[in-house]
Amino acid sequence: KRSLRDLGIPVNQIIPEGGSLKYLKDLPRAWFNIVPYREVGLMTAIFLEKKYGMPYVSVTPMGILDTAEFIAQMEKLVNAWASVLSKEKVNYISYIKNQTQFV
């Protein structure tokens, strides 16, 4: 959650944490889904991708390499939306370096 905030990526919902039936209708509003643990949520992400065309990131951000890959995949998806929304593309390389340099 902190990394997403640092990168300027707004969070629609965190399921199942704090999730309720009232807010499930808002799931399709997300630009993409994050599945940090494949054991929990992967089937939902696959369903949402098939039904609504919502891509997902399923890399567990543990360790230097996987954290860098996780952020790089999010950068790709955010930049895909940037072109649709006429916004400037993002570059998370400096964030990746900062997060992995002193480990």
UniProtKB/Swiss-Prot annotation:
Catalysis: reaction(s): chlorophyllide a + oxidized 2[4Fe-4S]-[ferredoxin] + 2 ADP + 2 phosphate = protochlorophyllide a + reduced 2[4Fe-4S]-[ferredoxin] + 2 ATP + 2 H2O
Q: What is its main location?
A: plastid
- List required co-factors: [4Fe-4S] cluster
What does the record give as EC number?
A: 1.3.7.7
Q: Where is the signal peptide?
A: none
Could you tell me the keywords of this UniProt record? 4Fe-4S, ATP-binding, Chlorophyll biosynthesis, Chloroplast, Iron, Iron-sulfur, Metal-binding, Nucleotide-binding, Oxidoreductase, Photosynthesis, Plastid
Question: In which compartments does the protein localize?
Answer: Plastid, Chloroplast
Can you provide one Gene Ontology molecular function annotated for this UniProt record?
oxidoreductase activity
SUPFAM superfamilies under this entry?
Helical backbone' metal receptor (SSF53807)
Q: Which domain of life is it from?
A: Eukaryota
Q: GO biological process: what's one of them?
A: photosynthesis
State what this protein does. Component of the dark-operative protochlorophyllide reductase (DPOR) that uses Mg-ATP and reduced ferredoxin to reduce ring D of protochlorophyllide (Pchlide) to form chlorophyllide a (Chlide). This reaction is light-independent. The NB-protein (ChlN-ChlB) is the catalytic component of the complex.
Provide the protein name: Light-independent protochlorophyllide reductase subunit B
According to its UniProt entry, this protein's organism is Cibotium schiedei (Mexican tree fern)
**Gene that this polypeptide is encoded by:** chlB
